[in-house]
Amino acid sequence: PLCGQVLADFGADVIKVEHPGRGDDTRDWGMRIGKTETTYYNSMNRNKRSITVDLQTPEGVKIIHSLLPQCDVVIQNFKTGGAEKLGLGYEQLKAIKPDLIYCSVSGYDSSGPEAKRPGYDLVIQAEAGLMAINGEASQPPLKFGVAAVDMMTGMYAAQAVLAALFRRERTGKGRHIEMALYDCGLMITGYYGLDALLLGHDPQRYGNAHPSIVPYGMYDAADGPLIIGVGNNAQFDKFCRQVVQRPDIVEDPRFATNVERAKNRLVLGPMLKELIAGFPRELLLERLSAAGIPCGKVAGLHEALTSERTRRGGLLQEMPHPVAGTTHVFAPPYRLDGQRLP
């Protein structure tokens, strides 16, 4: 659903097809807004129109076929082969509209032995190794706090659709795009994935810390947590001299360079933990900012949503809602010519 929402934010007229009677499954996920919608549903479906069609009937399939001449793109997330059984596969719809852009989203490679397996974000996070690199080393593997695989797959799908539309403008040809949650989940592992290939085994989990930059992570000041990201040796020099006022630390050869700090993190870490705990958080943030060292307060979600930074940036908008009157939605995170899209 996020793919369609991204395209809708860009101005596409998106028609969401839902099951008669019950609608989309996510209408029952999360806190309820009225009788038929939830926060989960609304977070992925703004700016869309919605219709209900029984795709199990010939009449329902005819309705979809009748819409094709006025459509540029079809996005579907049936299990592999499901759309074809209904008469809604790429080749079947291409026969009606030859220049159609058709995007199939499934759990796994459509040509592999797992093609017909259902794909859920949590399962993919486990199977793609994402849970294995998340959390503390002393704790079990941990899933992300949000449906990261679902969201990234939606974003990649939107990119692919836009690229296909651009190609069609030049060539007049449609395209079949295939997206698999597993493929996108593996992509998210990024440099951790490449590290694992070089090591021949899983890299260590570091929780809020960084595998190769020290100090970099969450620390507890006297009155609350903050994030400190010392990205290079010059910053560490300022951190020691100007922030915690301990020049002896940076003058110690064990900590003079980032390579040495990473090597000796088990010695440096407890020292910094004890030091930082003796300062008020605001004082640390002031000194860190003055020294040009990346830092920030660890905020609660509600605190972040209602902050002046969020308000000033226009990151939350209110949209009219037929039941609630108005409802909050996230604004698209980009600006075009200095303006957020409505």
Spans of model-derived segments:
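Aromatic-enriched alpha-helical interface/lid elements that frame and gate functional surfaces
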Residues: V214-A291, C295
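Oxidoreductase and adenylate-handling cofactor-binding alpha/beta cores
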Residues: G154-G174, M187-L199, R241-V250
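N-terminal helix-loop segment corresponding to the beta1-alpha1 unit
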Residues: P1-R170
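Short Gly/Pro-enriched turn/cap motifs at secondary-structure boundaries
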Residues: R32, Y41, Y206-P211, Y216-M218, ...
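Short hydrophobic-aromatic micro-motifs
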Residues: S50-T52, I124, M218, P225-V230, ...
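Flexible, small-/acidic-enriched active-site or ligand-binding loops
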Residues: P320-P342
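Conserved PLP cofactor-binding pocket of PLP-dependent enzymes
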Residues: S289-G313
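Conserved Rossmann-fold dehydrogenase catalytic segment
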Residues: S110, S138-A147, E169-G185, Q204-P211, ...
